[in-house]
């Protein structure tokens, strides 16, 4: 499961009088102040080249339906932390940095802590509950890499064990780990494969003050939490690109993401390894309409020849400040349609049951999410939310609803 990154490329606010070289890449990679981030403080240890950010949360979810033998609710403690540590200082070109990331979730009661009865098994919607809800007791290191800047901070290479969600499709109003839309389909694209915990590299280049390009290459065989040097269950790779354009005086950002994926699948029998490939294109746009409203939209299509995932997606969303005097509070609403892939990599139709191979309805799942972020102070916020899911996981024509609340502590 792809993990959401804490820091994303912001829609550059109009408060910056004149953009300078490297501003775009700094917005993607570094933990810098940004509009709408009240928890950020200039930490004293930054003068030593240390940047860090931590989100810790309590999350409770309840569904109106659950598969027999699974729990209808869950209590989770979630953590997401990221670190940038400067290794070699170079004030002109940006220097050399170490990037590290940790993410995990733990069940807080007896049933939530058992994988066999865990909550997500009770509804199994295709786009997932939350990118950081990994399991009842699971903590992983999705990224540990070296970051090197060049050319007056206009170019950068990140190499090592990379988490591609930290760089690509970084729609800022939908990609915050705990504060915005909590369905995976709204946090990240469901079209572009964005693995974490895999060996890879990302190249970034700032073309001018309004345009940038990125190219990422990563293995795809290592699941979150596994050792990328020893995991070889599914050998493959993915190549992801991004062109981004900032316009409307910095209030809007458009992103275009082409990708190609290749897998060598070992079925574990006399058939041996089978090569599977996939390619597609996704795009997103976000726009700060005014001080009270920011909107976004994301769409994508994929070929999906025997590869797990979605073949199509279209989602729209908005963050709206309903109470002008509460500058840090906002109401979020998002709606998405996700089309299932024709086949997964083992050769079964992805919208069918691997066990019985029978059809369970159409291949379109629809998700509506409503949430409200209530900022208590600079460090604590409460986020109640509601999801309505039609045709969950493409397995039937029924619907489900999920209610939840998160208490998020950021520092």
Q: Which sequence ranges carry the predicted segments?
A:
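Outer membrane beta-barrel
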Residues: 76-220, 308, 312-347
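Outer-membrane beta-barrel pore domains and translocons
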Residues: 57-61, 103-105, 162-164, 218-220, ...
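Signature for the C-terminal beta-barrel architecture of outer-membrane proteins
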Residues: 18-23, 153-157, 184-295, 299-303, ...
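Outer-membrane beta-barrel "beta-signal"
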Residues: 399-411
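Outer membrane beta-barrel transmembrane domains
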Residues: 242-244, 252, 257-275, 282-286, ...
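Transmembrane beta-strand segments of Gram-negative outer membrane beta-barrel proteins
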Residues: 18-29, 41-65, 96-100, 108, ...
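Short loop/turn motifs that connect adjacent beta-strands in outer-membrane beta-barrel proteins
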Residues: 14-18, 30-52, 84-98, 151-154, ...
């Amino acid at each position: 499961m792809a993990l959401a990154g804490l820091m994303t490329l912001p829609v550059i606010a109009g408060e910056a009088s004149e953009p300078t070289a490297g501003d775009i890449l700094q917005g993607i990679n570094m933990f810098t102040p940004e509009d709408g981030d009240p928890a950020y403080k200039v930490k004293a240890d930054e003068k030593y080249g240390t940047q860090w950010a931590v989100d810790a949360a309590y999350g409770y979810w309840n569904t109106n339906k659950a598969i027999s033998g699974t729990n209808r609710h869950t209590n989770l403690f979630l953590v997401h932390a990221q670190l940038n540590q400067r290794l070699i200082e170079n004030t002109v070109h940006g220097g050399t940095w170490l990037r590290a990331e940790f993410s995990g979730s733990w069940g807080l009661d007896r049933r939530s802590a058992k994988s066999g009865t865990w909550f997500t098994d009770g509804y199994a919607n295709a786009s997932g509950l939350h990118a950081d809800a990994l399991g009842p007791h699971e903590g992983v290191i999705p990224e540990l890499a070296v970051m090197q800047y060049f050319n007056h901070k206009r170019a950068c290479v990140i190499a090592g064990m990379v988490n591609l969600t930290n760089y690509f499709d970084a729609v800022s109003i939908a990609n915050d780990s705990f504060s915005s839309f909590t369905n995976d389909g709204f946090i990240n694209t469901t079209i572009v494969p964005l693995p974490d915990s895999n060996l890879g590299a990302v190249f970034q280049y700032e073309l001018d003050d309004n345009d940038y390009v990125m190219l990422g290459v990563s293995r795809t065989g290592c699941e979150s939490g596994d050792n990328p040097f020893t995991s070889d269950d599914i050998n493959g790779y993915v190549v992801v690109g991004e062109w981004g354009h900032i316009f409307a005086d910095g209030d809007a950002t458009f992103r275009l993401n082409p990708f190609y994926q290749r897998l060598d699948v070992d079925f574990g029998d006399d058939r041996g390894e089978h090569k599977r490939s996939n390619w597609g294109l996704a795009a997103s746009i976000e726009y700060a309409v005014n001080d009270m409203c920011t909107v976004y939209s994301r769409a994508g299509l994929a070929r999906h020849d025997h590869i797990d995932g979605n073949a199509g997606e279209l989602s729209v969303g908005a963050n709206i400040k309903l109470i002008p005097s509460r500058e840090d509070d906002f109401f979020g609403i998002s709606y998405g349609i996700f089309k299932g892939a024709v086949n997964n990599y083992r050769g079964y139709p992805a919208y069918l049951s691997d066990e019985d191979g029978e059809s369970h309805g159409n291949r379109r799942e629809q998700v509506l999410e409503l949430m409200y972020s209530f900022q208590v102070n600079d460090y604590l916020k409460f986020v109640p939310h509601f999801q309505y899911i039609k045709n969950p996981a493409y397995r039937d024509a029924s619907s489900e609803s999920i209610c939840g609340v998160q208490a998020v502590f950021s520092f």
